[in-house]
Amino acid sequence: MPKIADRTFFNGTNQKLDRLGLRKLWEDLEALLTSFELLVVEARNSNGGAAVRVMFDDRFRTVGGWENRPTGGVNWTKCYTINGTRVCLGIEIQFSARSDLLIVDVQHLRDEITEGRLDVGVIVVPSK
């Protein structure tokens, strides 16, 4: 099973999860990312970032409630309405070998937060 090796929160995000009522959604996200069997296949190109990315995308689709934007924006978003207020969490999954794509993911999240479509952004990256 995959595990979360580290979490880094910026600009009060950890407190924002509680204040906006997104903690449960955060916990659901962590479960989605870790509660499945990730098998290592002894074949060339079987365990690359693209294969792992497909596994994560399949998990988001299976769980349901997550909206996917395949290109040009945040990969996955989920929103709740709490006491009449809509709050949203956005996820970028970065498993590409190209490190320059990470800044593009940061830009996507920043744009969505700045424009008021997201309240919290998350980037998922491999630990090693």
What does each of the following model-derived ranges do?
Residues 6, 84, 107-110:
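Generic structural signal for short, flexible, solvent-exposed coil/loop and linker residues
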Residues 96-128:
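Catalytic cores of nucleic-acid endonucleases
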Residues 1-73, 79:
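Acidic-basic catalytic patches of nuclease active cores, encompassing PD-(D/E)XK
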Residues 43, 89-97:
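Surface-exposed cleft-lining segments at the edges of enzyme active sites
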